[in-house]
Amino acid sequence: LISVMFANNEIGTIEPIAEIGKIAHDHGVLFHTDAVQAFGHIPIDVEEMNIDMLSASGHKINGPKGIGVMYIRKGVKIRSFIHGGAQERKRRAGTHNVPGIVGIGTAAKLAKENMEERSAKEIALRDHLIERVLKEIPYTRLNGHRTDRLPNNANFCFRFIEGESMLILLDQAGICGSSGSACTSGSLDPSHVLLAIGLPHEIAHGSLRLTLSEKNTMEEIDYTVDELKKIIERLRGMSPLYEDFVKKQNK
């Protein structure tokens, strides 16, 4: 079995799922994708993308928490997760979560109906955010692919700052951000994703993930960038590493 995230939850990169699935099938291997981040946000065709199994979650598409969906291609045999009753085709015994099932079904239907319009708006907001940040804040890098990324994701690294301090100041300005995934909230270690793609610890420590919504406005994006510029300048002003860097640049 090969299992690959459809899109990364931190840096937003969309993986070449169809190509990976073809490689798996060419070698007689089943292919599963964790599509939690992508489901309801970008088009997914399990046939064209050579997907045998796919998992998704309700809360990522404004559905209920605690409910998910698992697609299994007809003919693929898997072991039961919970033995006992015959619920869910004998794959998971136990009483059905009817409110959750109805909720995720409705959320998926609504997400599909307005996906194109919603994604277009989020992409416009995302690209405006990325363009301004990279243009107006020096010594900054965008993490993840520039275009093959989730419509609502932007992830940056700012050199010479510490991410936790940046998040505190952003929070004081009324801006929600993170320096990793929700799964690792509370950890002061740099993102394992950023380390895995080759970033050194000192740069990975200055990461910021911003997740957008169709309900955000251009005014809010501009406010975020304006506040972020002040915060980065303030933190770098207190950084001995940045001071040493500037001195070397001026020699």
Task: Give the residues covered by each predicted segment.
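Pyridoxal 5′-phosphate
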Residues: 1-251
